[in-house]
Curated annotation (Swiss-Prot):
InterPro entries: Aminoacid_DH-like_N_sf (IPR046346), NAD(P)-bd_dom_sf (IPR036291), Shikimate_DH (IPR011342), Shikimate_DH-bd_N (IPR013708), Shikimate_DH_fam (IPR022893). This is Shikimate dehydrogenase (NADP(+)). The active site is at 65 (proton acceptor). Shikimate binds at residues 14-16, 61, 86, 101, 213. Homodimer. Keywords: Amino-acid biosynthesis, Aromatic amino acid biosynthesis, NADP, Oxidoreductase. Belongs to the shikimate dehydrogenase family. It comes from Clostridium botulinum (strain Loch Maree / Type A3). GO terms for biological process: amino acid biosynthetic process; aromatic amino acid family biosynthetic process; chorismate biosynthetic process; shikimate metabolic process. The keyword Nucleus does not apply.
Amino acid sequence: MYTTGLIGKNINYSESPEIHNNYYKKNNIPFFYKIFNLNQDQIDYFIKNLHKNNIKGFNVTIPYKETILQYLNDIVYPADKIGAVNTVVVQEDKLIGYNTDYIGFIKSLQYYNIQVKNFKCLIIGSGGSAKCIYYALKELNAGDICIVSRNPEKARLKFEKKVKILNIKDENKLDRYDLIVNCTPIGGPNFREQKPVKLKEVKKNCVVYDLNYTPKRSKLLKEAKENGAFIINGEKMLIFQAYSAIGLWCLNGIKGGR
């Protein structure tokens, strides 16, 4: 039996163990998935003991999607371009990083039959998830993409120079966007009573996507729905990225072994 899991901080709310373990059981895959709640100073120890603990692969979530890069031997496209990794394959002599969030986000839009070509898009946040969504939207030929951040100067170091980056306090014309994506933990399980922005008005047929999936309807999504937007939470993205990660681990674990 191989171990897989999720590393992050304050992540006991995660639905990933249920998704993965149900899939493993249904498909007779000899894996088990668990939560690894780690402080940053515990990551070194976790990495050094991967083989000892029979860990074949793991997912990475907030706040370590960029931190994990320093531990990897190879980073596979598009994770190398994004600069953030959420899935790691553990081989005998190296760690390989992938970004299955990228795939999960694109597949979730396809699931809801949303075509973002030429959409004017707003990304809330500037961390690893935001970078992933930015490159996914570019891949899908979205139109103008604007990023709002609490720290725009720091955010500008992470994105292409041509990207429009604003202070989150300065962007109040949200009715100009066709798609708004919240890539912050605000509104999620650890910040349920907060919203990253106020949606007093949204464009007709605007899509508001909150990558948080707990609660099912964040305060942001509730407000968006009240204003006539089509709303999506991060559940489908979570499921699709999980299946992509499982595929990578199975290819490595069952066929490759170690």
